[in-house]
């Protein structure tokens, strides 16, 4: 049961990192790179971790909230919201949080016996993060 618990916790931590990467890609990728529309979270009324970080930092939180609400119906509001998120420290803070989840995921495996599977699982979070962000992010938005 300890092994199952460790793997379940690994999955939880890696899943959190995976979701944050997805949240970032919605902001730092392009339709062409992703093969689907980006900046969709804001248009769908989904307020992701990077958006909430930017809201907390914004000099005009009421204006920022108005953009959050307006993004559902206005491409201009969605674009301005994205620009304000990208101008904040949200990308850097989200990358830091992803790194924390990746470390937690790998730590969950530390008591498992050494094996190629364990090694692969320990490398997976960081390899996924670096690979997908390099492959799918717009170089114009890479600030890391």
Report the location of each language-model feature:
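All-alpha prenyltransferase/terpene-synthase fold signal
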Residues: 1-144
């Amino acid at each position: 049961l300890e092994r199952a618990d460790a793997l379940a916790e690994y999955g939880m931590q890696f899943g959190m990192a995976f979701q944050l990467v997805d949240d970032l890609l919605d902001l730092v990728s392009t339709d062409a790179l992703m093969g689907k529309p980006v900046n969709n979270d804001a248009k769908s009324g989904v307020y992701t971790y990077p958006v909430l970080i930017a809201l907390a930092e914004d000099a005009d939180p009421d204006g920022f909230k108005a953009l959050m609400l307006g993004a559902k119906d206005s491409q201009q509001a969605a674009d301005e919201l994205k620009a304000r998120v990208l101008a904040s420290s949200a990308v850097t803070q989200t990358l830091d949080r992803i790194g924390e989840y990746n470390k937690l995921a790998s730590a969950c495996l530390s008591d498992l016996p050494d094996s190629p599977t364990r090694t692969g699982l320990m490398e997976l979070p960081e390899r996924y993060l670096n690979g997908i962000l390099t492959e799918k992010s717009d170089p114009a938005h890479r600030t890391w």
